[in-house]
Amino acid sequence: MSEQQTASLGEFTFECGESIPDLELAYETYGEFTGDNAVLVCHALTGSAHVAGGRRRSDTSGQAHAWWDDIVGPGKAVDTTDYYVICANIPGSCYGSSGPPSTNPETGEPWGTTFPAVTVGDWTRAQRRLLDHLGVPHLHAVVGGSVGGMNVLDWAKRHPDHVNRVAVVAAAARLDPQCLALDAIARRAITTDPNWNGGDYYGEDPPVEGLALARQIGHVMYLSKSSMQDKFGRRSSGIDAGRDSFEMDPAAGFFPYREVESYLDYQGEKFARRFDANSYLYLTRAMDNYDLASGYESDRDALAAFDGEALLISFTGDWHFTVEQSEAVADAFRESGTDTAHHVVDSDHGHDAFLVEPDRVGPPLDDFLVDGVAGKAVSDTTPDDDDGDEFAPVHTSLFSD
């Protein structure tokens, strides 16, 4: 199992104009570097550098379980016997990299909300600096899902000559207003928790109730209506089941505590034990702010300098980052002259599909890394298909021919 390491990368100026004296990035590497086989994996919103290798020791910073262990590893889609894989915890997070809960060396106290505002562009710049530290001048590929996919797009835009292939999974060029609104409500849940205290809660009781509510909102975004119906329906966990989880008004005792409520309460409470509330504020704002076309006339212009190959993977049940949004990014790549494929997976799992359906994500990703858009398991959208379907069929099994 790869061990988490920390790189001290010196003074770093964020896009907001503020600086910190020493940017620290927690990272893990897998496989051996041969000079042309480096693959950077960009994690999603609340992920960590621990992308592969099973379960960590309980005393190790970050998520206990590797978050993409079914995709990254020996003999898997991102095969660590062939590739040198790097995954770094992004600035602003709380899994070992510089962020609100880390220590300000000038005060000896946590930064809290005095930590500079972070952007997706800052993540890319920090990753580039880490790669320089590791002696990796060029990448075979950058791969990422969700906001990690936005991070991938930023690589194609910001460092087009530094990477051969980009794989953008369940992402978009920017968030739509509905997702912006839900993220704003989630942040409000945190900042209205009395324990948030303007972000100065370290050493005191943290705003766990607000953070748990924020995560519950996120989980609703990650599931599809179909998956929620299949998973929960309207089933009850029992009238009294919720009393131990939160305070209830007397009239609530007449009504059932439903399984969907129980699920959200469990997920919220679990998340609040492992993540930092200020980091959640910082990272959701970075995601909300990202716009591929920023500084350019269009998405196509933003990608014009990229001369590699691009793969988009999207999921029909994902309303957080829709198939149509991925198709728009694919079109921008195509219009800029990039060899591009958009592989659509028919799935009811919502946004979570990129994490929970490795048998659908693995084959196209594997073949793309090896053969580019000509890969055997890589399908592409064909709006002019004779059957009238908007999108082409996709492979449905890891073992399909």
Swiss-Prot record:
Substrate binds at residues 215, 352. It is an enzyme of class 2 (transferase). The active site is at residues 146, 318, 351. It catalyses: L-homoserine + acetyl-CoA = O-acetyl-L-homoserine + CoA. Residues 37-358 form the AB hydrolase-1 domain. Pfam families: Abhydrolase_1. Its EC number is 2.3.1.31. Transfers an acetyl group from acetyl-CoA to L-homoserine, forming acetyl-L-homoserine. This is Homoserine O-acetyltransferase. The gene is metXA.
